[in-house]
Amino acid sequence: MTCAYIAFTARGLALAQQLAAACPGSVARGGADGVRLTDWTAAQFAQSDALIFVGAAGIAVRAIAPHCRSKAADPAVVVLDEGGRFAIPLLSGHLGGANELAQRLAAVCHAVPVITTATDGRGVFAVDEWAKRQNCAVAEPERIRYVSGALLAGQSVCYAADWAVSGTPPAGVEPAAAADRADFALTLIPTGEALHLIPRIAVLGVGCKRGTTAERLETAFAAFCAEHHFAPQGIVRAASIDLKKNEPGLAAFCRAHGWKMDFYTAAALRTAKGRFTSSGFVQSITGVDNVCERAAVLAADGVLFIPKWARDGVTLAVALAPFAPDWRWKNDEP
């Protein structure tokens, strides 16, 4: 987690520096050294995982207000008074990790963590915090409140999962009799009205003709996801043959999605384990019978999930890394 601290007094700056020594991050003093709060907040909101204000909560609230978008995208925001008495998570308590960060910071300076989320206050299962701990994206953040609301009202909720979840489900959480009856689902193929939690375990294998533009790749990718009902939030990186390393369109496409790329030689691709769609034409051009499937499997160190799909000179495939979800969702669980 990349942290950014800002303080407004000498005492607050000393506390920020103490906190940064334990939870590393940059430290700035508002109003000094040319640091303007509005500029600092805008920059850090875009590039940091967490913003820590040492000062009045009102200052922090006014500073972040223009930048808040959604609980799925906003960074964690925590405020501490300059005396280090209280640590208050203001934004992204679960998905952004602000609640946990506030507790860590409080432990450093012996402050009281002031956690205001209802599920935490009552010890109720927090589906969004569980999603974060299982490295899942939340496809529909607006649906979190229905799951949490039911649990807070003393009702049970049902889940479906495409993987076995080890351990015992929390109180009030039961397996659904059928997938379409689930209140939340752990899946890469979201359907229906449930809250879908998307494991971030997928690798996109890519093959393309020389000179393929980012726009063409984007169009193909959208069609690929639509045809397979696949959740793009599950992809964490992309992979291809080293012949494509200098393709500007491919680089721009991956950059737009925030994916790093892995490139493999033909010899390395031939070592991939599994059954793959073979093409004599691809073999004659690249030296290996399949690029997208083999590259995805190698990068994921896993298994093929969606086989080769082709359109307009673009081939795509998806492989999955190993995934072993469990029911742990709190810091104090073993």
Pin down the residues of each PLM region.
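Donor nucleotide-activated moiety binding/catalytic core segment of transferases
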Residues: 41
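Conserved mixed alpha/beta catalytic, RNA-binding, or beta-rich assembly cores of soluble enzyme
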Residues: 8, 12-18, 25, 34-36, ...
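C-terminal non-catalytic interaction/assembly regions of soluble proteins
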Residues: 241-294, 300-304, 311-314
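Structural signal for terminal/edge beta-strands and the immediately following C-terminal loop/tail
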Residues: 297-334
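Conserved beta-strand termini and adjacent loop/short-helix elements that scaffold enzyme active sites
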Residues: 29-32, 116-118, 264-266, 307
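Extreme N-terminal starter segment of soluble prokaryotic enzymes
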Residues: 1-5
